[in-house]
């Protein structure tokens, strides 16, 4: 009887502890924001909405992986509230990571800003941007 009571009490304490230890807001959210840079050292915020991609970004920042360190995604030609310095942002649903990509989608953060009216034609066809020198710097709050 004493053994059964000890097991029940242990299980109760374990369940109660799970309720007390909650994930941090950055870890619990379905959306995460990351600051990235490129060869120009300008800063740009990327919104991620896919849990696997959020984890990959965190793994890159923690040094747990070096695979696919560069950012690729489809540009939206409008400002985002989390990225007010720029007249464009990446569609969070299209953001991914890569090792190597074709040259036609490569550009720097400020070059896109300066040539945004040309994006989607011969410059960044399909509005796909794959900055070869992009890298994440840190996770940020929105």
Each PLM stretch: what is its role?
Residues 1-28:
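Secretory targeting and sorting signals
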Residues 27-142:
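Function-determining sites in protein domains
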């Amino acid at each position: 009887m004493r053994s059964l009571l000890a097991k029940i009490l242990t299980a109760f304490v374990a369940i109660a502890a799970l309720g007390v230890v909650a994930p941090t807001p950055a870890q619990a959210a379905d959306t995460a924001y990351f600051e990235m840079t490129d060869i120009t050292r300008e800063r740009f915020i990327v919104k991620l909405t896919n849990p696997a991609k959020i984890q990959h970004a965190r793994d890159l920042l923690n040094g747990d992986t070096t695979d696919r360190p560069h950012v690729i995604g489809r540009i939206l030609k409008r400002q985002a509230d989390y990225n007010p310095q720029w007249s464009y942002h990446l569609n969070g649903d299209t953001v991914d990571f890569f090792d190597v990509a074709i040259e036609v989608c490569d550009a720097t953060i400020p070059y896109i800003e300066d040539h945004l009216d040309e994006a989607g034609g011969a410059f960044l066809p399909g509005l796909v941007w794959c900055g070869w020198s992009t890298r994440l710097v840190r996770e940020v709050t929105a």
